[in-house]
Curated annotation (Swiss-Prot):
GO terms for biological process: pyrroloquinoline quinone biosynthetic process. It holds the Pfam family PqqA. InterPro entries: PQQ_synth_PqqA (IPR011725). This is Coenzyme PQQ synthesis protein A. Transmembrane segments: none annotated. It comes from Rhizobium meliloti (strain 1021) (Ensifer meliloti). Keywords: Plasmid, PQQ biosynthesis. Pathway: Cofactor biosynthesis; pyrroloquinoline quinone biosynthesis. There is a cross-link at residues 16-20 (Pyrroloquinoline quinone (Glu-Tyr)). Belongs to the PqqA family.
Length: 31
């Protein structure tokens, strides 16, 4: 279960970055 917390943090960070990323960025908006 130790890896669950960091995983959640990574996902949250990815979602936050995606939120502020431009729609025409390198990666498509998935969230």
């Amino acid at each position: 279960m130790a890896w669950h917390k960091p995983k959640f943090i990574e996902v949250s960070c990815a979602m936050e970055i995606t939120r502020y990323a431009p729609a025409d960025g390198d990666e498509p908006i998935l969230f």
